[in-house]
Amino acid sequence: MRNDVHLGHKARKRFGQNFLNDPYIIDGIVSAINPKPGQNLVEIGPGLGAITEPVGREVDKFTVIELDRDLAERLRNHPELASKLTIHEGDAMRFDFKQLVKPNNKLRVFGNLPYNISTPLMFHLFEFHRDIQDMHFMLQKEVVNRLAAGPGTKAYGRLTVMAQYYCKVVPVLEVPPSAFVPPPKVDSAVVRLVPYEDLPHPATSLEWLDRVVREGFNQRRKTVRNCYKGLAEPETLETLGINPGMRPENLTLAQFVALANWLDATHKTHA
């Protein structure tokens, strides 16, 4: 059998499909999710049901979002799952997750995310952080390292700062390429993202936060003084607790937010 065909379905490159087929890993992921009846569970990209089936054995109803028409059809006719699933056929990147929220029942989102869209998809989900209890995702290991990174490390970047702005990040388990059909060329890992009830460092303007973070990491080897020249004077940076001689890659989330909030307040005053 060809190594890109699994359970009679050929993996589609344009959808970034790699199907999980290692029972030990699947068991570890389902244990991490810990699904319970009555919870508002949403799976992104169920594929051939490697995680969907064991989750379905634990709960009576849940929602899946699948872009691949053939796979969505397969789930509609699944002997065990068909009666339990609400299937949304379409692109999770454009999906309004608010429509799935129920009173006092936040979303628990999980999935083996296509690696080619995982970062923009997470940014899309962060917009719904108030409606999400937690998220469990299989991602490229390098992306999980970035999500969990600390200031001054090579992996620390825009994704780190914005993920940690919204969520507590907990790496759960590492997954080798051999756990998939076809095997990807990279190692994978599962991460748990838990949105904060109250943001630890709230920004008064997400536009300003996004701007200072982007500009900082686009010029990560410059000093903070040079990176934000024209936005903030060195004296202002020092007042905010930021050393103008350090590099942006060494700034903490709290420092990025302090700078963004100062810029927001200053521009509102001058508006």
Swiss-Prot record:
Annotated keywords: Cytoplasm, Methyltransferase, RNA-binding, rRNA processing, S-adenosyl-L-methionine, Transferase
Catalytic activity reported: adenosine(1518)/adenosine(1519) in 16S rRNA + 4 S-adenosyl-L-methionine = N(6)-dimethyladenosine(1518)/N(6)-dimethyladenosine(1519) in 16S rRNA + 4 S-adenosyl-L-homocysteine + 4 H(+)
Domain of life (superkingdom): Bacteria
Record EC number: 2.1.1.182
InterPro entries to which the protein is assigned, alphabetical: KsgA/Erm, rRNA_Ade_diMease-like_C, rRNA_Ade_Mease_Trfase_CS, rRNA_Ade_methylase_Trfase_N, rRNA_adenine_dimethylase, SAM-dependent_MTases_sf
Residue numbers binding S-adenosyl-L-methionine: 18, 20, 45, 66, 91, 112
A cellular component term, taken from the record's GO annotations: cytosol
One GO biological process term: rRNA methylation
Subcellular location: Cytoplasm
GO molecular function, one term: rRNA (adenine-N6,N6-)-dimethyltransferase activity
NCBIfam families: ksgA (TIGR00755)
Function: Specifically dimethylates two adjacent adenosines (A1518 and A1519) in the loop of a conserved hairpin near the 3'-end of 16S rRNA in the 30S particle. May play a critical role in biogenesis of 30S subunits.
Family, similarity comment: Belongs to the class I-like SAM-binding methyltransferase superfamily. rRNA adenine N(6)-methyltransferase family. RsmA subfamily.
Protein name: Ribosomal RNA small subunit methyltransferase A
